[in-house]
Amino acid sequence: MSNVVIMGAQWGDEGKGKIVDLLSREIDVIVRFQGGNNAGHTVIVGDKSYILHLIPSGILHEGKTCLIGNGVVLDPVVFWKEVEALAERGIDVGPQRLMISRKAHVIMPYHKALDVAREDFKNKESRIGTTGRGIGPCYEDKMSRIGVRAGDLADPALLRSKIEAALVEKNALFTALYGREAMSVDAVFDEVMAVGGRLVPYLTDVSSVIEDAWANDSGVMFEGAQGTHLDIDHGTYPFVTSSNTVAGNAAAGSGIPASRLDRVVAIVKAYTTRVGAGPFPTELDDEAGNHMQSVGHEFGATTGRKRRCGWLDCALLRESVRLNGPTDIALTKLDVMSGLKELKICVAYEYNGQRLQHPPQEQNGLAHVTPVYETMPGWDDDITAAKTWEDLPEAARNYICRIEELLGVPVSMISVGPERDQTLNRK
């Protein structure tokens, strides 16, 4: 069985949830390896829609084991709400098939308060568009070696001592710098334990579970969140998330050897979207952009914010290919492009008198590039009922083939609608 990484190749919201859901049919274990509840995966099954922020999309398939790896930052309240919501809809979310790494760090109430206080404190121009869910401050504490880990929820004395130590610094920031009220040790401890205690049965050694799966010849899928260009190191810094979103982090964020990863599927939306602030060379503020936004229902699953829309950017995607080494591409939302008379693909950038095949590496460089476009004919056909490659109009097939040529990676899956069965497989 293969061990496959699913990662977003753009700025997130590429449709990873649907692809994970589809490929979960062939895989026994699904692992979330980074990020927190600042990302949302939407999966539509029949007339039911599921939005998942922490729990892997594979939970919707009976008998699959779903793991939350050490690279994730976990909000206990959000996790438990997802558990209850899925249970109410008849999904088995017991600890025999849903497990959390003891090494995963916990988002504490003071992390969320600090996230909001900092963003409010900044002037409008310096804000990065954080979701305010405490992701960044939690990762900060992890790197500072003062964080609370999921395993600490089983040790109330240790948990309380960590809260006491953390609030010495956090309360100084709240009161002296941000003009907020100090937080109480007792209040924070009680809030966390009210839910945290319920998570204890879900705690496990994720590395060991994966190792056992391999011993039984089971395949494992590693589910990423956000997208490549939100990566803390390789994204459009500082307009990025607080974790490594690239495929290579699947190993570190799950506690497994990188040599076991043998397939990387890059999820690419047929156009480009971005939520929040940050450079976006192909952004559109015209009829075509409005078409993508309205037909594609481009609102964030986590924040509800309207997504910015633009033409497909293959210069940006070349960087994703270089960083992730994908074996194949799953192209999503191709149906949204129906009705556009012509399509444009950014094939390079003009920057400081040079033509670049990849984004400039200096900070703010991407904000000053000029996209170089190729124009292709569009199509009017409704492709949502397409079942085979031949069912697609010639213009759509040509669009896909040009993407393959520009990136040097085959497109193996094509999504033509939100439903599970609205997917073409080109294997």
Curated annotation (Swiss-Prot):
It is an enzyme of class 6 (ligase). The active site is at D13 (proton acceptor), H41 (proton donor). InterPro entries: Adenylosuccin_syn_GTP-bd (IPR018220), Adenylosuccin_syn_Lys_AS (IPR033128), Adenylosuccinate_synth_dom1 (IPR042109), Adenylosuccinate_synth_dom2 (IPR042110), Adenylosuccinate_synth_dom3 (IPR042111), Adenylosuccinate_synthetase (IPR001114), P-loop_NTPase (IPR027417). Mg(2+) binds at D13, G40. Its cofactor is Mg(2+). The keyword Ribosomal protein does not apply. Its EC number is 6.3.4.4. Coiled coil: none annotated. One of its GO terms (cellular component) is cytoplasm. SMART domains: Adenylsucc_synt. SUPFAM superfamilies: P-loop containing nucleoside triphosphate hydrolases. It catalyses: IMP + L-aspartate + GTP = N(6)-(1,2-dicarboxyethyl)-AMP + GDP + phosphate + 2 H(+). GTP binds at residues 12-18, 40-42, 307, 333-335, 415-417. Binds 1 Mg(2+) ion per subunit. Substrate binds at A301, T302, T303, G304, R305, K306, R307. GO terms for biological process: 'de novo' AMP biosynthetic process; IMP metabolic process. This is Adenylosuccinate synthetase. It comes from Oleidesulfovibrio alaskensis (strain ATCC BAA-1058 / DSM 17464 / G20).
